[in-house]
Every structure is written in C-alpha cells, then in structure tokens.
Amino acid sequence: MFKKRESVTEIEEGNLLSPKFDNDGLIPVVTTCVNTKEILMLGYMNVDAFKKTIETKEAHYWSRSRKQVWHKGKTSGFIQKIKEIRIDDDQDAVWLSVDIGNGSSCHVGYRSCFYRSIPCLLYTSPSPRDQRGSRMPSSA
C-alpha cells in the first residue's frame, strides 16, 4: 500500500503514497469535521492504524499511552467516518476530514479536543521596541 521513498520530486509532485513516519514510527494526524470544518483533534498513526483507516474508511489512531491501535469511537459509539484523507507535501503529516454526526471526538466528552481558548493578548511577547529601554540612539 505504501511505496518506498525514492526521490523528493516523486514524493512532493508524484502520485506515490509514501508517508514519512517519525523515529517512533508515528505520523501526526489533524482531524477536522467535514461539515463545520472545525478542528476536532490531533492524533498519531502508525503504519497499521493508517492502513486500517484507509481500508475501513473509519479513523484508527495509535494510542501513545496504551501503545496500541485504537478504533476511534468503537467504545463511545462516536465513530469517525472518513470523508477525505490528505497528506502534506513531504508526506509527514495527515489530515482527515470526518463525519461524527452529533457526536464528540474528545475523550472527555467535548465535540472537539480544542475546547479551551487561550486569551492571546496575555501571552504575547513584548515587541523588540519595548525591550530597548529608554535610551534612544544619539543622532549626530
């Protein structure tokens, strides 16, 4: 199913599916809702999970804590039905567009795992201008 990585051009411009798994054998997966386009979760797949996802048209991920493939929603009933799979230009990240109906994706019960909002103004770095202090360069 997955092809050997032969050349950069073939990977970036060709039709070969040749995912680049990291040193732990994983590839990151961003999952979004096909209807609302909201980000549902970030997960990981190993080779087996990726193949099962393609074959079954339902999302399978690698659980880094349990060290096993899990069929998303098998226990909760909120199966992620695959509508589209994309892989990025150098094939080291995957994007799933899924249908979850009215279900949730987060293991704590929320529709999206990204349910927390961080007020960005509280976490911005001071601009370099603010860090200069009160001395201005002298003009000659």
Labelled PLM ranges:
Residues 47-61:
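A short, polar/charged loop-to-alpha-helix boundary motif
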Residues 123-130:
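Conserved small/polar residues in nucleotide/adenosyl-binding loops
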Residues 35-36, 47-50, 91, 101-103:
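Short, charged/polar surface micro-motifs in flexible loops or helix N-caps
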Residues 38, 93-95, 133:
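General beta-strand recognition
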Residues 2-24:
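Short, basic/aromatic recognition patches
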Residues 59-119:
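Short, structured beta-strand-loop surface elements
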Residues 134-140:
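Hydrophobic alpha-helical segments, chiefly the membrane-spanning helices
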Residues 17-47:
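Short beta-strand segments
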